[in-house]
Amino acid sequence: MYYGFDMGGTKIELGVFDANLQRIWHKRVPTPREDYSLLLQTLHDLTREADEFCGSKGSVGIGIPGLPNADDGTVFTANVPAAMGQSLQGDLSGLIGREVRIDNDANCFALSEAWDPEFRRYPTVLGLILGTGVGGGLIVNGNIVSGRNHITGEFGHFRLPVDALDILGADIPRVSCGCGHNGCIENYISGRGFEWMYKHFNQQSLPATEIIANYNLGESKAVAHVERFMDVLAVCLGNLLTMLDPHLVVIGGGLSNFEHIYQELPKRLPQHLLRVARLPRIEKARYGDAGGVRGAAFLHLSK
């Protein structure tokens, strides 16, 4: 059995998956945000409850909204203050008597999609999240590529490419980013960036849902905005494809529900790729909110 924890700032969800990778049990509880001992006890109790349900001990994986430190295994996660700087992996492993694997929740998203029955045949899968920010993960032969510092999927912190500046104008503000730098692409091609860009060019604040609704009605400002956004998205994704050359791209996050993306990217991407390059397959994520739990459980499928 494979146990996967999706540990967020407000809730912890545990999913149990059988040998066929089908979810057979799950439970959700509030996250103890401030008390590390209580956080460990909560994870312990959920694990024991799953053991009782299964009649055996399953493997344990945890997806966190943050990064494990590559050198000492401590956790960096602003959303769960109780776990910040703690050796969560080692502490929980000692408490429940088995190996625990921990990874970034965006990597878990990508791993979940890569282990989809249809998608497993693709050797390299790029999971791309276009949500409040931009991130994701790279999966090669069913395994997460973490890199030296566990930051391989931090795509949102690439700077705006020169071709994007040609589209947006050289005087486009280099928006300050939470990482401490300016001009990171997540401030332009995320859901938040989608709204910011509309406000910048139209001097009007609208939520993404309303902009998209106006676009579907053919409203001129919304149409011009979406065209501009798609061009910038294609430039940024083109750089990623040239660097990583995946067979499959799976898009998640709030903007993944904008179906126009899947029609427009194949038209716009080729001009930003090498002439010999063939487009990867581009698909919408299949597992939605369940992807974090699935991917965390499947950390034990990786080598």
From Swiss-Prot:
E.C. number(s) listed in UniProt: 2.7.1.59
Cysteines paired by S-S bonds: none
Record carries keyword Transferase: yes
Keyword vocabulary terms for this entry: ATP-binding, Carbohydrate metabolism, Kinase, Metal-binding, Nucleotide-binding, Transferase, Zinc
Positions that bind ATP: 4-11, 133-140
PANTHER family: N-ACETYL-D-GLUCOSAMINE KINASE, ROK (REPRESSOR, ORF, KINASE) FAMILY
NCBIfam families reported in the protein's UniProt record: PRK13310.1
Descriptive protein name: N-acetyl-D-glucosamine kinase
